[in-house]
């Protein structure tokens, strides 16, 4: 997409250099009842439901719902101190927890984001996510109130 206003060609070139985010991988929803939520997506919406996966490093049990163009990830607390437990304490009915984008190079993405003032949560080092690939989370206050997860593909 070329922008005609304010020197469109130069702006287009700059946007190409800065391009980092790939496709939307999934939207994650924290739920108070994992089995009921999965059944609702399967029965009511006819979606294909994956098996529950425990992710102890992240304090969650997840179920992926396959859609034609992306996925929904249902999140349920696993163990003491789960971030989903505290999310559900504030949002007892559940709700959107984060949006997940793919990136080609997680370390380059982190460097570019941090150079622009974005905050990486946790230690700042990638962890292995539910797909077996490195992931990072970005502070929601830096992204219009939305927690962002990035995964290297």
Name each region found by the language model.
Residues 50, 81-86, 122:
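A short, acidic/glycine-rich surface segment
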Residues 68-72, 79-81, 106:
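Short, charged/polar surface micro-motifs in flexible loops or helix N-caps
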Residues 17-18, 86-92:
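Short, flexible, solvent-exposed loop/turn segments with mixed acidic/basic and small polar residues
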Residues 18-58:
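Long, hydrophobic N-terminal alpha-helical segment
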Residues 4-6, 17-19, 31-39, 53, 63-66, 79, 91-141, ...:
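Vicinal oxygen chelate
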Residues 24, 31, 41, 65, ...:
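Short, structured motif recognition centered on aromatic/hydrophobic residues
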């Amino acid at each position: 997409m070329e922008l005609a206003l304010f020197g469109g060609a130069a702006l287009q070139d700059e946007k190409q250099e800065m391009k980092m985010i790939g496709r939307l991988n999934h939207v994650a929803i924290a739920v108070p009842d994992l089995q009921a939520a999965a059944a609702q997506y399967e029965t009511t919406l006819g979606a294909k439901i994956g098996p529950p996966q425990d992710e102890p490093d992240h304090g969650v049990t997840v179920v992926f719902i396959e859609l034609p163009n992306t996925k929904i990830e249902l999140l349920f607390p696993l163990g003491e101190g789960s971030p989903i437990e505290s999310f559900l304490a504030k949002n007892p009915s559940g709700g959107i927890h984060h949006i997940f984008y793919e990136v080609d190079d997680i370390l380059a993405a982190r460097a570019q984001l941090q150079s622009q003032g974005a905050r990486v949560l946790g230690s700042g080092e990638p962890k292995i996510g539910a797909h077996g690939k490195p992931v990072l989370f970005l502070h929601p206050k830096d992204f219009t109130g939305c927690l962002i997860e990035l995964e290297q593909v």
